[in-house]
């Protein structure tokens, strides 16, 4: 039996036409269709022409959003020695060595980002069962295996976000809040597009970008004209 749409969602769907919108027009519409009683998240869902079952067609990287994400991010750091104090002073929410690894093994997952120093990675590798399914296993490519924990903590707290293509070659990324100005959402979406283009897998063949949709977390999907987004030049303000 089909699920009955709420009146709120029906009214939002009526505003969206079956076509690809210019980027700023799409983001303005995203804001108009964010009608829930809370500040909805702005989401991007991007289908790429890759098959991640092949290692040379996998995409995993990070994006730094110039306008932030509007979210408070809890960062955990697994390290040892003097780096423990560095991580604590740099604003990490959870810091530890063996004891933090044990807590995670027992099911403690009270964080959105996990950073580890290289010396701890052999022990962190034991957490594959807990971290892998959630996409939280630290990796050098994701910027979460590093000796410079202070810089990494600051970057993720400021809105840096790790993402990857799923098994179907689709990227799902949160790039702001519906309360952001449409122009600020556009700056973030452009940063995401440029990051995906810069990190095109070497094995990707044919048309790389298949489609891109944006939406508020409780709103309808809105197709974006990908060529218009890629051709867009945003002048940096001094």
Curated annotation (Swiss-Prot):
Alphabetized GO MF terms: rRNA binding; structural constituent of ribosome; tRNA binding
One GO term (biological process): translation
InterPro entries: Ribosom_uL1_bac-type (IPR005878), Ribosomal_uL1 (IPR002143), Ribosomal_uL1-like (IPR023674), Ribosomal_uL1/biogenesis (IPR028364), Ribosomal_uL1_3-a/b-sand (IPR016095), Ribosomal_uL1_CS (IPR023673)
CC per GO annotation: large ribosomal subunit
Matching Pfam families: Ribosomal_L1
Transmembrane segments: none
Keywords: Repressor, Ribonucleoprotein, Ribosomal protein, RNA-binding, rRNA-binding, Translation regulation, tRNA-binding
Family stated for the protein in its record: Belongs to the universal ribosomal protein uL1 family.
Subunit and partners: Part of the 50S ribosomal subunit.
HAMAP family registered for this protein in UniProt: Ribosomal_uL1_B
Alphabetized PANTHER family for the sequence: 54S RIBOSOMAL PROTEIN L1, MITOCHONDRIAL (PTHR36427), LARGE RIBOSOMAL SUBUNIT PROTEIN UL1M (PTHR36427:SF3)
Function: Binds directly to 23S rRNA. The L1 stalk is quite mobile in the ribosome, and is involved in E site tRNA release. Protein L1 is also a translational repressor protein, it controls the translation of the L11 operon by binding to its mRNA.
Protein name per UniProt: Large ribosomal subunit protein uL1
Species, as recorded: Picosynechococcus sp. (strain ATCC 27264 / PCC 7002 / PR-6)
Gene transcribed to yield this protein: rplA
């Amino acid at each position: 039996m089909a699920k009955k749409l709420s009146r709120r969602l029906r009214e939002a769907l009526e505003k969206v036409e079956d076509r690809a919108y210019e980027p700023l027009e799409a983001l303005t519409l995203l804001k108009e269709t964010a009608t829930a009683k809370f500040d909805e998240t702005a989401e991007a869902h991007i289908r790429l022409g890759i098959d991640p079952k092949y290692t040379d067609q996998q995409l995993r990287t990070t994006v730094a959003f110039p306008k932030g994400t509007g979210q408070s991010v809890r960062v955990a750091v697994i390290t040892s020695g003097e780096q423990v104090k560095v991580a604590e002073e740099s604003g990490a929410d959870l810091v530890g060595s063996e004891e933090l690894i044990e807590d995670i093994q027992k099911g403690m997952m009270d964080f959105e980002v996990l950073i580890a120093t290289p010396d701890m990675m052999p022990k962190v590798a034991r957490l594959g069962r807990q971290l892998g399914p959630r996409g939280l296993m630290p990796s050098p490519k994701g910027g979460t295996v590093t000796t410079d924990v202070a810089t990494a903590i600051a970057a993720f707290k400021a809105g840096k976000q790790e993402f990857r293509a799923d098994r179907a070659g689709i990227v799902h990324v949160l790039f702001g809040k519906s309360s952001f100005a449409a122009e600020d959402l556009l700056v973030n979406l452009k940063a995401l597009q440029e990051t995906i283009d810069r990190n095109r897998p070497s094995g990707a063949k044919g048309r790389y970008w298949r489609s891109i949709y944006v939406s508020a977390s409780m709103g309808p999907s809105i197709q974006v004209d990908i060529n218009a987004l890629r051709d867009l030049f945003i002048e940096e303000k001094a």
